[in-house]
Amino acid sequence: GSDLLDFSATISNDSVTPYSGIKVDLEQTGTQRVHDYYGDMTILGIENIQGSNLNDYIKGNGQNNTLWGGAGDDVLDGVSANNILVGGIGSDTFRGGAGDNIIYGESYSTLGEAGTETDTTSRDLIDFSGAGNSIILNLSNFTSINYKDETTLSLEAQTSIGYGKNKIYNVEDALGGSGADTLIGSNIANVIDGGANNDIIFGFGGVGNTLIGGTGNDTIMGLLGGDKIYGGTFDGTT
């Protein structure tokens, strides 16, 4: 079966010091310090984690995990397999693994794939900074991210390379990897950082984008105006 470990109802700002969330690594088979509130725990045979209302770090184990961050600014690391990562309210960071992932910046219904935008003040980031291959990333379908599933697509944040069919909803910002990436914004104001290598960054329909080339000979294009463009080191066209 699919088992869930739920931390959502126990930790509050009044019960812990400092105000930090849980840290769970499902790949860890030994004892791990999840939180001072819980002490040391050994977590075995668990596929799904519900985070607290604070700033959590939750890492999967390659067993088709569903990871909910809950409220707070969370980091969700899918590792591998076919994961569902749900950030919840807050500015969250997602790292998909090798597989077919579905990532929701805000909320998620178990009955379908449509995310629901409930928090307009936070910003979510999809992080490819550990990916070595080139990425083609298109945010232009409203506030969702669509991947063109080419052989150059890598979601793995460590050393392995994964090529999955990935769907991402309600994520505003993107950070490229060390490959030559193509990153296209949506119709809202995005923050897009190409990272290393020779990237193509296109602001698309949002007004007031922040477009950062990073290192390499980059091509950066705004569209509607009001964009902040940073070429970085040894950049070409801006």
Residue ranges, per PLM feature:
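Short, well-ordered coil/turn elements that cap or connect secondary structure elements
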Residues: 18-19, 43, 80, 131-132, ...
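Short beta-strand elements of solenoid repeat domains
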Residues: 4-6, 48-50, 57-59, 66-71, ...
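Short loop/turn motifs at secondary-structure junctions
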Residues: 1, 42-45, 54, 122, ...
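GD-rich hexapeptide-repeat beta-solenoids
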Residues: 2-38, 95, 99-162, 208, ...
